[in-house]
């Protein structure tokens, strides 16, 4: 009887636990290891709007219980942490690969462009004419991806103290 009780308790605890965040993706350009590497420590910000609605960038993209990728998130603020061991170039495509989500001129994170729709991109409040996946991630960059119409004009991201 004690074994049955222990199993029931374990099942209840497991079902109430938070679900794990996304696991690191197969991005060949983004190393992952057992701890953070801070040779290069920068941050970019990503906002995603799908038909005028904000789509949250999840916490713990690129982080598992055993490893952390050089591109990752700690929370749902949209801040992408670039914590790397060298000065290699990382793109938004690299971050989306770690996240295991689609990014192109026809799709953002599983949402595809429909008839009469398009993807608009701004970097630091300036229109970006290239493919969104080619955006090079840089310190304090403010990246906005919008699939619409319903395109919104956003204020620049205000960085929290310490970033």
List PLM regions with ranges.
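Sec-dependent signal peptide recognition
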Residues: 1-9
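Ubiquitin-like/PB1-type beta-grasp interaction modules and other compact soluble beta-rich domains
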Residues: 17-163
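C-terminal motif of bacterial Sec signal peptides marking the signal peptidase cleavage site
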Residues: 12-15
